Amino acid sequence: MGKQVYLHIFNAKILDVFNQRFEDTELWIDNGSIYFRGKSKDLTAKNNFNAEGNYIVPGLIDAHLHIESSLLAPSELAKLELRHGVTSIFADPHEIGSVSGVSGLFYMIQEARNTPLHIHYMLPSSVPATNFEHAGAVLHADALKPFYGFPEINGLAEVMDFPAVANGDPDMLEKIRDAQAAGHHADGHGAGLTREQLAVYRAVGIDTDHESTSGKEALERIQAGMKVFIREGTVERDEKSILPVVRKNNQSYFSFCTDDKSAIDIQKEGSVDNNVRLAISKGIPAERAFTMASYNAAVAQHVKNVGALTDGFIADLVIISNLDNFVTEKVMTEGNWVDKLESKVTTFTSPAVNAELSLNDLKLPLKSDKAHVINIQPEHITTKHTIESVNRDQQGNFVADQDYAKIIVAERYHNLGHGLGIIHGFNMQEGAIGSTIAHDSHNMIIAGVDDKPMIIAYDRLKRMGGGMILVDKNGFTRELPLEIAGLMSDKPYQEVIAKQKSLKGAFAKISKGIDFDPFLTLSFMALPVIPSLKITDQGLFDFDQFKFIDINA
């Protein structure tokens, strides 16, 4: 060939995703892509790299996540992701879109340009997610369509409003058609959908889903022709339930995602690299696990020339020392080694928090001691709906205790009111916790067993412009301000993680026997499109009946 390329990598065992094997071979890289895979006497290189016998796999891909759940700005999350061998992510900026509309989307695109991590955005399909909560913005099809002109946009994010699709809502169908007309596709959100209901999604071209919580559900989606993103996040951990149905003949339909994962957990156990390690530990061959985490995800997200280490593919790769319990040794994106990252977070003007609450708003009169109660399910964003006997005072008002706490969601954009309910599972002995992260409209959400700490939490969240807070019975607080739309911090990830740990440590002191992330769990208690009983700023919502219900049983 007689050609000189930029970089020659040799002495490596390199994954072949097409033949599902590691091969002792070489890579010749030029202009950000792999020019040739194999040994050559004709090629020369300006730079040579001895991989010292280590393994090389394609850069890992997170097929679906929400950056905001990490509490980090995109450029800060990128630093963590790259450390764990993740070179591409497909992110749904639904959260900031719900708070700040198109200005939030522009901000996320701008931030994505400050990092070598490939950040592909899927435009939020449902802002607001439903008509059962008030959001800070409304994103119709005509507002989203111009964004397809940005190279960072890869399609339409998880379509979660099943009734809108089933009933032929014109705006929802236009959003899906616009994505397809731009050469992209639409992701699905099939939580709790039956096999017949999946056909409604397939009829409009929705071809992925990340909401499978069992092997049975995963196989139903594959039978329907959908690609399955196996989720292992902070709250929702579905991988162990799904891995047993992953086979050689269907593995091409599976890839990995984290969906919602805290910065603490990414630092502690990893991102998609954790999914891979878990898969290998459960008997999935390493070649298959790494292929699922790279090439399969790229195919599912309709991205070409990504996810494989061969001629013509983007040179995104990870060097690892072993397969079973691998650690990322070195990372490359587009032919460049990722070394020290020093980007600064872009500033963002956030909307004010306009909710108004008083002690009187926390009174919850009941007709009897029987009430509908939200029951937390650890490691899941779903809840159970039960009718329980609870305590009341002499005036008939609910009295919180160690088993049953109050939970309130206050509309934060225009002070349109609040919903008040009862929740079981936080095991709080005192105080309150609160946040302006409350999927999907991100109103203010507070849970507690003492009214005064709940009001202190409200007041501090309003003053800081959004964030996370814990208040003990004496009024002492632990706080994490979230300067970017009340969702993300503009601080370095190390500082954010330290404050997250402080909050979790403080919660351990006011609760008993909790082994899940209380703040991330709290954030999903306001999500009405996920079963079974949730609460929004408009009241208590029964997913099974798909309507609001009275708290009195």
From Swiss-Prot:
Q: Which cofactor does it need?
A: Mn(2+)
Which keywords annotate this record? Hydrolase, Manganese
- Give the EC number(s) under which this enzyme is classified: 3.5.4.2
| Reactions performed catalytically | adenine + H2O + H(+) = hypoxanthine + NH4(+)
Task: Indicate whether Signal appears among the record's keywords.
Answer: no
Q: What is this protein called?
A: Adenine deaminase 1
Q: Which GO terms describe its biological process?
A: adenine catabolic process
Is Manganese given among the entry's keywords?
yes
Q: Report the sequence similarity comment from the record.
A: Belongs to the metallo-dependent hydrolases superfamily. Adenine deaminase family.
Q: Which Pfam families match?
A: Adenine_deam_C (PF13382), Amidohydro_1 (PF01979)
PANTHER family to which the protein is assigned, alphabetical: ADENINE DEAMINASE, N-ACETYLGLUCOSAMINE-6-PHOSPHATE DEACETYLASE
SUPFAM superfamilies (alphabetical): Composite domain of metallo-dependent hydrolases, Metallo-dependent hydrolases
UniProt GO molecular function: adenine deaminase activity
